[in-house]
Structures are given as structure tokens and as C-alpha cells.
Amino acid sequence: MEMTLMVSLCLTTLLTLLLLKKFLKRTAKKVNLPPSPWRIPVIGNLHQLSLHPHRSLHSLSLRYGPLMLLHFGRVPILVVSSSEAAHEILKTHDLKFANRPKSKAVHGLMNGGRDVVFGPYGEYWRQMKSVCILNLLTNKMVASFEKVREEEVNAMMEKLEKASCSSSAENLSELFVTLTSDVTSRVSLGKKYWEDETAGGLKKRVRQIMELLREFPIGDYVPALAWIDRINGFNSKIVEVSRAYSDLMEKVVQEHLEAGEHKADFVNILLSIEKEKNNGFKVQRNDIKFMILDMFIGGISTSSTLLEWIMTELIRNPECMKKLQNEIRSTIRPHGSYIKEKEVENMRYLKAVIKEVFRVHPPLPLILPRLLTEDVKVKGYDIAAGTEVLINAWSIHRDPAIWGPDAEEFKPERHLDSTLDYHGQDLKYIPFGSGRRICPGINLAMGLVEVTLANLVGRFDWSVDPGPNGDQPDLAEDFGLDVCRKNPLIAFPSSVA
């Protein structure tokens, strides 16, 4: 009797739950979601990503549309592949999409996410960004470091002159990393710590951090598999590398404090701000260390990567190289002398070349992910709070509806009469992003890139050893924190002095 009653109660409860679920499903508001490819339980759409996610996501967008919803494990990912959809994300609803998703690597490596590049949106982030822009990245501050850029570019030119005299090839990829790192080191820290092993290996630590930031910790997306990040050493590596970088930078900061200098490098500027209170906001010691790290990551992942793609495309397109050389050499006398930043200001074709390389090879083809903080409609679709957003700048920059049937071609001429700039106002061209999260270091990066390119091309002719592509360097990519060349660019400089 008791058993019969128990079974009856269980069946009644089950039937009630089923009816309730059916009722709630019927009465629930219908949600209009973006198109989605079929996904596998547990991993979602992770199996559809290749080693070049910007390309695989572009291919998916051609089938499912410029706004599609994927799932990386349990995390919903909105992929944006058109300028119209990007406008709604970065302009119309910019504030709702201004946050960053949580990441094990960012939290462990970047001061708990208390930095400008990766930090969550909020009052603290706004204050930190304001400190960065108003004190470190103003046009006046960038201009004040012109002498540093001139000295470091000239040092690189001397290496190239020696290579030219001995008919030797140079690894331009490595030269560009050294150049941008030395400039960043002098601007940020007051001297060149990059190659100084006695300082504790800044080069080693920054590269380790960049390598870890490019990793894909599966536990962020599939919590049930978080144990993999533990047993493969990822978790412990984050702790080790972050501590080593922090200890190294503590020594650098102490050197500045003991020297008592008032040299206008970023550390001294930030130390002076640390002593002040601005509306109750105070810069902490760790904030200084990791704002400097932002500078190194931004400098290496933008400037050096851009320079190697510029030289790659110019060597592959000799007619473009010749046009640029003619522009530079027709205005500079005598040949072989250093080309100053003021002389570069009116070089229209040089600026067009840089813009075109940013279009076809954006260093960050997938703009750093954003996190939606409240429900919103985008292009008529319902997007739920907690959705991560990936904007495929690579796809937008190659859209034939915007750029014409030759969108895949390298053609600097398309920018000669264009009003496009790097500030993301027109969402068809967003190499530095747009909105509240746009890269704040645009002027710092472009000042170095323009003067470096003018001297590289104005003072030397360039060639490469014949390979599988003839006398052209390949275009193979390596996807990481940025997208650089898979193979280093090795080229022969020939001085025209």
C-alpha cells in the first residue's frame, strides 16, 4: 500500500513538472537569436576553429551571415563580420559592450585584470585610462620622445649599412621587435632594459607573458575540463611568470626612486602621480608595473608586426616599392641622411601604404573580446547579457561590398583620396578598434612606424633569396596575441647612399 502510494506521488509529481515545463515554454517570450551552426555537446563550436580563427570565422560568416552566434564550450560568442553590425556594437550600444570577459590568463598575468588593455570596464578602469592618456600618450608627450625614436632608428640603420657593405641578409622581423622594444623601454623605463640580462631578463619575461596570453585555457570555456590547465602546467606557469615580471619591475621602480631623477619617462611620471590623490583615486605600485607591461605588449604586437607586414608587401609588390621610394627620395637630400619625422608629414603615398597594410594585415584581426553586460537587440536579434563578442576586423577589411572586387589585393592607391583614419569613426576600417575600448596608443605607434618606414625604404633597396614563391616572401601567418609572420622576414638591404 505504501509502495503504491509512493509510486503514485512520484508519477503525479513528474507529470506536474512536465506540464509546467510545457506551459512555461508556450508562454515564454519568443527569443530571436542570430543564425548558429550546429554545435557539439560540451565543446560547442570549438571544433570549427582552425589555427587561424579569423579565417575560419570568416568562412562561417559567409554561410551563416555577418552576425552569428557560436558557443565556445558553454560560453555564447557573438561573431560580428560586417561594418553595419560593428556600428551597433561599437557605437550604438558601446557602453553595454564595453566590458571584458574574465580570463584565467589575464587575471593571473595582468595584475588581476587591473590594467588598461584587459581590465573590466568601470570607474577604476576609466580613471586608469585617463591617467594613461592625459599623462603618457598626449601628442605633446609623444612628440617629446622624437629624439629617442631618431636614435633607435639610426642604430638600426647602422646595422643595415653594415649588412649592405657585406652583402649580408638581415632578419627584419627580429630587428623590428628590438627596435620597438628599445624605444618602448627608453620611453617607459628611461633606458634600454630589453636586452639587459643583468636587469633580470625583461625580454624573456615579456615574451613569456605574450606567449601565455595567446594560449587557450580550456577551463575558461569548459569548466569540467579545467583540470587540463592544471596538469599541463598552465596554471603554475602563470603564477611563476607573473611573479618574475613583478619582481623585475619592482627593481626598476626602486632604481628610479633611488636615483631621484626627474627624467620624463613613464615610470617617473607614474611615480609622481602615485604620490597624489586625484578625486580619491590613487595609483598603486602594481598599477605602475602593469601599465608599463601594457606599453610593451602594445608596442610589440602593433608596431613591429605592422612593420614586417609592410616590408613583406612592398617586396612582393615592386611597383608599390618604387612609387614609395620615388616619393621619399625626391624630397630628401642628400641621399643616405636620416629622414626626420617632420619630413614624413607630407608623404601621402607612405601613409597610404601603411593604411593599406593595416587593412589587409590588421595586427589584431579579431579585436580583443568584449562582454555584454545587459540584454540588447542587435540588427533585430536578441543578445543576452553575458555573451562575449568577437569583431572580425579582418573580415570587415576584406568585404567586397565596401572595398570593391579587388578587396583581396594590396592596393595603397585606394587610400590616396580617402578620409579614413585610425580612430574608428568609420566602422569599415578599425585597425585599432573603436569606441571606449579603442587602443589609446595610436599616436605613439604611428610616430615610430612612419619614420622607420621612410628610412628603411628611402635609404635602401631590398631583395630576398629566391624560394618557393620566387623572389617574393611568403604570406604565412602565425596567430597569437597578434597575427605576425609565421616565418621571419629575411631580406638583403642595398644602400643607395
From Swiss-Prot:
Report the locations given in the UniProt record.
Membrane
Q: Cofactors per UniProt?
A: heme
Please list every transmembrane segment annotated in the UniProt record, as residue ranges: 4-24
Tell me which residues bind heme: C439
Keywords noted in UniProt: Heme, Iron, Membrane, Metal-binding, Monooxygenase, Oxidoreductase, Transmembrane, Transmembrane helix
- Any one GO molecular function term: heme binding
Species this protein is from: Arabidopsis thaliana
- In which family does this protein belong, per the annotation? Belongs to the cytochrome P450 family.
Chief subcellular location equals membrane
Q: Per its UniProt entry, what is the enzyme's top EC class, as one word?
A: oxidoreductase
Entry EC no(s)? 1.14.-.-
A single GO CC term for this protein reads:
membrane
List the membrane topology term(s).
Single-pass membrane protein
A Pfam family found in this protein is p450
The protein depicted here goes by the name: Cytochrome P450 71A18
Which portions of this protein are annotated as coiled-coil regions?
none
